[in-house]
Curated annotation (Swiss-Prot):
UniProt EC number: 1.8.4.10
GO molecular function: 4 iron, 4 sulfur cluster binding; adenylyl-sulfate reductase (thioredoxin) activity; metal ion binding; phosphoadenylyl-sulfate reductase (thioredoxin) activity
Reactions catalysed: [thioredoxin]-disulfide + sulfite + AMP + 2 H(+) = adenosine 5'-phosphosulfate + [thioredoxin]-dithiol
Chain residues that bind [4Fe-4S] cluster: 133-134, 216, 219
Protein name per UniProt: Adenosine 5'-phosphosulfate reductase
CDD domains the UniProt entry points to: PAPS_reductase
Gene, per the UniProt record: cysH
Range of residues in the leader sequence: none
Chain residue ranges for the region called Disordered: 222-247
Function of the molecule: Catalyzes the formation of sulfite from adenosine 5'-phosphosulfate (APS) using thioredoxin as an electron donor.
GO cellular component assignments: cytoplasm
Coiled-coil boundaries: none
């Protein structure tokens, strides 16, 4: 199916996602990213006025997904949600990933600074209303940034949490209105470590300190040994996702 991305409708994107999902079930991460490049990248942009119509999202826990994507699209756009609450180690990893892998990091930020949010909402909104804090500092900036693209690539994996156990490889993202590709959804922790070792991938130093899932500093703690890797996120609260991923 050939689609002029500059005028693609939601229906066109839904059909692209459905066709991709049907033809690429069981495909490797490389094959999924190659399809993404051919469908939404520079290989699909001739005559459409569109370039870089997909973006890769990374929380900078490691550089695996960015490294994979840069192999098929050098200089690819990489989305980082700069919430204002990140660990210094995460910011350092972001800067290193951009330099080492030669990608274009786009820092998506909330309309208000942390200080402005404190003044408007009260100090430490994350502790009182974590869902609202995520909506303001993650979901809204993400939605605004994704509006400029036709597809986004994420690093969610099925083994990370029960809420992600059925994550598809390719789907239409109803929440943000574009195609969503999860090329490493089927990867195990062993697959990740093998790729990191084989390619000397950059890893956030906090991983070696016992943080298997890294988010904003105030809302991230070390999970108990053997527990859900994401159980250290918003520990003690009835919250397991920040609102970015329905699956």
């Amino acid at each position: 199916m050939s689609v002029d991305l500059s005028s693609a409708t939601e229906g066109d994107l839904r059909e692209l996602a459905a066709r991709g999902a049907a033809s690429l079930e069981g495909a490797s991460a490389r094959e999924l990213l190659q399809w993404t490049e051919e469908t939404f990248g520079s290989g699909a942009s001739e005559g459409t006025g569109y370039r870089n119509s997909f973006i890769v999202a990374s929380n900078m826990q490691d550089g695996v997904l960015v490294h994979l994507a840069a192999q098929v699209h050098p200089g690819v756009d990489v989305l980082f949600l700069d919430t204002g609450y990140h660990f210094a180690e995460t910011i350092g990893t972001r800067d290193a990933v951009e330099q080492v892998y030669g990608v274009n990091v786009i820092n998506a930020r909330a309309e208000a600074s942390v200080a402005e949010q404190d003044a408007a909402e009260g100090k430490d909104l994350f502790a009182r209303e974590p869902n609202r804090c995520c909506a303001l500092r993650k979901v809204a900036p993400l939605k605004k940034t994704l509006a400029g693209y036709k597809a986004w690539v994420t690093g969610i994996r099925r083994v990370e949490a029960p809420t992600r156990a059925n994550a598809p490889l390719i789907s239409f993202d109803d929440a943000f209105g574009l195609v969503k590709i999860n090329p490493i959804a089927a990867w195990s922790d062993e697959d990740m470590q093998s790729y990191i070792d084989e390619h000397s991938i950059l890893v956030n130093p906090l991983v070696d300190e016992g943080y298997p899932s890294i988010g904003c500093a105030p809302c991230t703690s070390k999970p108990a040994p053997g527990s859900d890797p994401r159980s250290g996120r918003w520990a003690g609260q009835a919250k397991t996702e920040c609102g970015l991923h329905a699956s």
